[in-house]
């Protein structure tokens, strides 16, 4: 009965929210929440719900993805973006019991410093801009199912202007008790703005609905994952550039090329692969169809949309690096360090004794 009530509540919630978020990119507030939150996600294509549950930083993508035997409980990710912007995330986990988990996360995206001018062209000095979020995450596991939620206080500032919002993620996952197989569904960034930059500011929240699965075949050192994102609106998500030139037909008329149904569907898909050489070393590969379609040059697509990375664990310290090729002029790099503070504290205690 409780499951039926929850399903009914979610259906009403989604029915109400879908029309509000049926917009293309550029019209959303706090859109930095779409960025990958840790090195693993970045290396697997930027969107993933079902990667290794032992990775603490996965809770930003899927709050229901937990594991009772986390190798680390503290994780720091540092991203280098283009034009001097930097992005950092910090995560911490506390196991309340074998079935209940509490996570805390901080995200900060700094855009750097800018020169300000008034309408007359006179300098007003420099100013900075940034986005940030504080996340409290809770998950409850009733094997083989897990439910999780993220409550996020989000903020954004540009010079003397600021905006705040309250957002919620809801997710559920099925984790096979014996095989390396996971299925997950996540509804992200449902919420509202507490305040806007000005009274005239009108933005929608960065809503997203995602579903994904991952599977590692037995006796095969590879884990495959597929994630579908931006499932709503169901309509065309393609941005039709009005400046894009069409094809000239036999009569000399310009005909705009339309995007096929297959292309519209494939842009919602992200695929990833992990090469699992051992528990202490793996390589990650990913492909993002939407990124390749939207950000690559029409005459030279190169490797846009691809991503890769690796993880190396030495005792209680885990180091990871990933790179995502965003466009021809560059990409995003992520350096991550994860620690098991309990083990480190235990070692220090033994030394003192």
What is the role of each PLM region?
Residues 1-3:
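N-terminal secretory signal peptides that target proteins for export/translocation
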Residues 5-16:
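Sec-dependent N-terminal signal peptides
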Residues 17-22:
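Sec/Tat signal peptide C-region and signal peptidase I cleavage site
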Residues 23-353:
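Subset of outer-membrane beta-barrel
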């Amino acid at each position: 009965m409780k499951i039926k009530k929850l399903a009914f509540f979610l259906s009403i919630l989604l029915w109400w929210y879908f029309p509000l978020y049926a917009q293309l990119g550029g019209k959303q507030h706090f859109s930095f929440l779409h960025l990958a939150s840790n090195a693993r996600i970045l290396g697997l294509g930027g969107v993933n719900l079902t990667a290794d549950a032992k990775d603490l930083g996965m809770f930003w993508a899927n709050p229901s993805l937990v594991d009772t035997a986390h190798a680390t409980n503290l994780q720091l990710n540092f991203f280098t973006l283009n034009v001097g912007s930097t992005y950092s995330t910090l995560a911490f986990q506390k196991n309340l019991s074998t079935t209940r988990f509490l996570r805390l996360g901080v995200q900060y995206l700094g855009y750097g410093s800018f020169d300000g001018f008034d309408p007359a062209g006179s300098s007003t000095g420099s100013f900075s801009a940034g986005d940030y979020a504080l996340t409290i995450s809770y998950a409850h596991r009733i094997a083989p199912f897990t439910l999780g939620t993220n409550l996020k206080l989000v903020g954004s500032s540009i010079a003397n202007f600021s905006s705040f919002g309250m957002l919620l993620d809801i997710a559920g996952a099925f984790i096979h008790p014996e095989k390396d197989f996971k299925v997950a569904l996540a509804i992200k960034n449902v919420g509202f703005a507490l305040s806007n930059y000005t009274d005239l500011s009108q933005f929608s929240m960065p809503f997203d609905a995602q579903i994904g699965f991952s599977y590692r075949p037995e006796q095969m050192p590879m884990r495959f994952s597929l994630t579908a994102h931006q499932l709503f609106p169901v309509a065309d998500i393609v941005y039709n550039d009005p400046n894009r030139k069409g094809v000239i037909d036999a009569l000399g008329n310009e005909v705009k090329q339309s995007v096929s149904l297959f292309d519209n569907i494939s842009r919602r898909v992200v695929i990833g692969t992990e090469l699992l050489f051992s528990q202490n070393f793996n390589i990650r590969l990913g492909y993002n169809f939407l990124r390749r379609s939207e950000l690559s040059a029409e005459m030279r697509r190169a490797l846009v949309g691809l991503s890769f990375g690796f993880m190396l664990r030495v005792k209680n310290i885990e180091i990871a690096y990933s790179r995502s090729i965003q466009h021809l002029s560059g990409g995003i790099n992520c350096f991550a360090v994860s620690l098991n503070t309990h083990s480190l504290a235990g070692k220090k205690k033994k030394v003192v004794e």
